[in-house]
């Protein structure tokens, strides 16, 4: 449904933002 789609979009955005920080930290 709509809520699931929004959740997926936010989750993808979060991963895009956090992944570079995690890679930079390691």
UniProtKB/Swiss-Prot annotation:
The keyword Secreted applies. Disulfide bonds: none annotated. It is found in: Secreted. It holds the Pfam family Antimicrobial24. Keywords: Amphibian defense peptide, Secreted. Its main location: secreted. InterPro entries: Frog_Litoria (IPR032021). This is Citropin-2.1.3.
């Amino acid at each position: 449904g709509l809520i699931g789609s929004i959740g997926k979009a936010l989750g993808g955005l979060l991963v895009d933002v956090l992944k570079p920080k995690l890679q930079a930290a390691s």
